[in-house]
Amino acid sequence: MQRQVVIEEFKQRNLNQPYGDASHLLRALAYKVHPYQWPTIGKEISHIANATLEEVKAFFFKYYAPDNAILAVTGHITFEETVTLAEKWFGPIPRRNVAPRSLPAEPRQTEERRLTVERNVPVDALFMAFHICERRHPDYYAFDMLSDLLSSGRSCRLVQHLVQEKQVFNSIDAYISGSIDEGLFHITGKPAPG
């Protein structure tokens, strides 16, 4: 196990840059029951440093198997070539019964939750999130389109209105989390000075 590599990745993404832990803080605020409240890599370095090889292996064999894998292939290759190569490289891996996915549903949020963090960062930042439907729900694609309409490109609604016209933000973005279960619609921005 390359523990130090994972620790360095955690530091690089979460500790060594301004706002690096913003998504961790926001998820912990947005989710009270569902495991989405915890980052995959862990909440702190001790989670990585204290993980035993036995725990990592047990987790791997519980959740990682050909039975629940997805293979994405791109490039100049035919379907037949893809099948041949997939069978060659992945066919020998034995099937295993993986644990059924059983996660608690996040209760409906009925109140606003806020967290103010004061740090020495280059500029203030705003991170907001709103609960949205699961990825398999038909409305998921409407949220995806809405996030693009609001923040993709210089002519998008949020940039035109809040950055160019009102000049209350220097930058603003909207995006959705691609979660299997109910996800989040994010709005992030850097307010203009003053």
Q: Language model features by range: what are they?
A:
Residues 9, 28-69, 97, 101-106, ...:
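Histidine-acidic residue clusters that define the catalytic metal-binding segment
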Residues 10, 14, 81, 89-97, ...:
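A generic secondary-structure signal for well-formed alpha-helical elements
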Residues 16, 136-139:
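Solvent-exposed, non-transmembrane alpha-helical starts
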Residues 32, 37, 65-66, 70-134:
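An aromatic/glycine/proline-enriched structural segment found at the starts
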Residues 35, 57-61, 113-117, 171-177:
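Short beta-strand/turn micro-motifs at beta-sheet edges
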